Amino acid sequence: MKVAAIQTVMGLSPEETVPAAEAAMEAAMQAAEKPDFLILPEYFSYYGLDQKSAVALAQPLAETPAYRMAQAFAKRHKVSVQAGTILAKVEGEARVENVTVVFGREGEVLAEYRKIHLFDIDDLGNGPFRESDYIKPGNDIVTWEFDGVTFGTAICFDGRFPELFRALRLKGAQIITLPAAYTMITGEAHWELFARARAVETQCHLIACGLGGSVVVDGETKSSYGHSVIVDAWGTVLKRAGHGPETLTATLDMAQVEKLRKGIPVIRQRRLVGETVTPAN
């Protein structure tokens, strides 16, 4: 499975960020070995001046520029695209949803996942933050099939909850994706650590696509960590990005996943935790 993580940077307008993301995706498709699957970061289309402005600009999911671009791109290039995350307006709700949507080679929707664990924290150096003030959490654990491979996904803060990743493995996931927008403080300390740990404990390849770059708002600089990584099921970092815009590509060996699971059959050997999801196999 040939994959590409399209690391884009923070922006304050979809009119700026969506075309930039599309240009990076177009460049990735010019490679001699074209990817089968592309992923963008969390908040790739709009980071927002603040929470209120992000909510004010939200539209119904299928009407957003980010959704329309990703769907058209998938159909045009016959490639699967995971459109990072999009803030989507929900009828009758004051809060929006943080949704990642996956398109197949014909632009059909393969999956939609709504972020379950929201980033509500006390002051770690940049002041407190409560994502739940403006985002409605999801509830569903989501997997999908593409080219004979089972994918699962989580979003950013979800990465701190290994039980979600175990549930994805039990639902049959072989590749797990993680669009994210980590802070500089948490990113430097935990981002790659979590990516490798989640890959090892699930015996899945993991594509962690992080938003990078910085914006200045009212004289204050806001930054997102970036440093996307593609990690194999053994926990080896195959590719690693920096802080700016960058595209990572890798060919994921699906036979390695099955070999590891047969060699270290952790799902069969579990004793301390009851089933939350019935194993797929």
Predicted segments with their positions:
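N-terminal phosphate-binding loop and adjacent alpha-helix
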Residues: 7-24
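Cys-nucleophile CN-hydrolase/nitrilase-fold catalytic domain and related Cys-dependent amidase chemistry
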Residues: 23-106, 110-112, 182-201
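A conserved C-terminal secondary-structure "cap"
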Residues: 257-281
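Short, basic, glycine/proline-bearing loop/turn elements
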Residues: 8-12, 51-58, 149-151, 178-183
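Residue-level recognition of beta-strand->loop/alpha-helix junctions
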Residues: 7-9, 39-41, 114, 210
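Active-site catalytic loop in hydrolytic enzyme cores
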Residues: 91-171, 184-193, 197, 259-266
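Extreme N-terminal starter segment of soluble prokaryotic enzymes
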Residues: 1-4
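CN hydrolase (nitrilase-like) catalytic-core segments centered on the catalytic cysteine
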Residues: 61-82, 150, 159-248
